[in-house]
């Protein structure tokens, strides 16, 4: 499964959906500031693989680590999944703010306060606070979430410009 956020049907964790709907029992979540076009152009990047099972992290690290891609491991599966969901939401809000031409100061407020709230939510869900200041949180938000071509950023702009509602899962 290659996805981020929460399951659109249930609002639950995607890793739980994989476990429920497949024979897989040892799952992980990958996140980080990795734009597909930059990865394909072999530009340097880093990501984190989180799993409750060390071997999932080890296998993923061995498969993806290269001279241009640094792969870190974590056991904070819920933190990485929560950070991924929050980055999606914050990207949408940043797109809305940019469409309203509110400026970089407001973007700074959205990023800093959004990450603070994401961390609080994560702690309530048994995540580790440092995950949100790492690759899966601030790293992903800076590189991907605030990128004009990010789908959720574009959704946020569309909500303001076109007045249409967009489902963000």
Residue ranges and their predicted role:
Residues 1-2, 28-31, 48-51, 93, ...:
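Short beta-strand segments
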Residues 87, 91-98, 123-169:
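NAD(P)-dependent Rossmann-like dehydrogenase/reductase catalytic/cofactor-binding core
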Residues 1-44, 60-62:
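Rossmann-like NAD(P)(H) cofactor-binding subdomain of soluble oxidoreductases
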Residues 6-8, 79-81, 143:
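Short, small-residue-enriched loops and turns at beta-alpha junctions
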Residues 31-33, 75, 147:
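Residues at the C-termini of beta-strands that transition into short coil/loop
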Residues 38-40, 83, 147:
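Short glycine-biased active-site loop of nucleotidyltransferases that positions the nucleotide triphosphate
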Residues 17, 21-25, 44-131:
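Internal alpha-helical scaffold of NAD(P)-dependent oxidoreductase catalytic cores
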Residues 12-13, 115-116, 153:
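A generic alpha-helix surface/boundary motif
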């Amino acid at each position: 499964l290659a996805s981020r956020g929460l399951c659109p049907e249930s609002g639950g964790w995607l890793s739980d959906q994989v476990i429920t709907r497949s024979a897989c029992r040892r799952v992980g979540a990958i996140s980080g500031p990795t734009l597909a076009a930059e990865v394909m152009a072999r530009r340097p990047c880093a990501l984190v693989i989180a799993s409750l099972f060390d071997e999932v992290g080890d296998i993923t690290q061995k498969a993806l680590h290269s001279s241009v891609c640094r792969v870190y491991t974590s056991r904070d599966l819920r933190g990485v999944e929560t950070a991924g969901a929050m980055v999606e939401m914050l990207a949408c809000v940043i797109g809305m703010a940019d469409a309203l031409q509110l400026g970089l100061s407001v973007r700074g407020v959205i990023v800093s306060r959004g990450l603070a709230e994401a961390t609080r939510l994560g702690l309530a869900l048994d995540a580790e606070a440092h995950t949100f200041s790492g690759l899966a949180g601030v790293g992903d938000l800076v590189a991907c979430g605030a990128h004009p071509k990010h789908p959720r950023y574009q959704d946020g702009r569309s909500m303001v410009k076109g007045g249409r509602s967009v489902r963000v899962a």
